[in-house]
Amino acid sequence: MWLHTLWRGDVGHDVFMEITQRMIDKYFSHPNYYRIDGKPVLMIYDLPNLVDGLSGVERTAEALAAFKQRCADAGLGGLHLQMKLDYYNGVETKYSEFAVQLGFDSLTNYQFGEISNIDRDYAAIADELPPLWEKWSTQFGVPYFPQVSIGWDNSPRFATTRRFGVTKNSNPAEFERALRMAKQYVDTHNLPARLITVNSWNEWTEGSYLQPDDRTGYGYLEAVDGNGVLGT
């Protein structure tokens, strides 16, 4: 994932070329780099910021198409570009147009706060996920991969006046239930890969991490692997 959020994460064409060439040379050819259909996968975190930095949708489309071609020319088979779906309501954003116009191959989310009111019980948020996944699977013209979060609490980062809500009663059992719903989605849709995005490995200051702690031990990691949720 290219996390080019502020401070000043928007980049012009020259810097974009430099950064993406470094990705090609240093990362995409690594044998452990994740691929779909043989192509390295890159998720764009902040699409509006990217478009602003590259001076509009048309020039961004040209830059991304050239990026894909450079990946192909480097013997990488091309590039699988993934768009992060963010605050989509079907009316006010143009993400449904961007997905096709900019040449994205799939989309997913980064965390629950982008799609739902997070200031409530985890179970209530999880119950809303399958209908949203179904809607997005047909609305954008590209495959949608489901996303599951551990929770949300970024209050350690801010004064009390800037807190954005806290997910209540998140626990490994509810996380496992959400993973099972995501697996059901993947099992029943014709996707180019069996991919579920999880937030996150180590976002301690956002209250969404898989790593073990004193409160739940290895509970979240066991929900992913030890209980056989995802299978093979």
Regions found by a protein language model. Name each.
Residues 1-232:
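Glycan-processing catalytic domains of CAZymes
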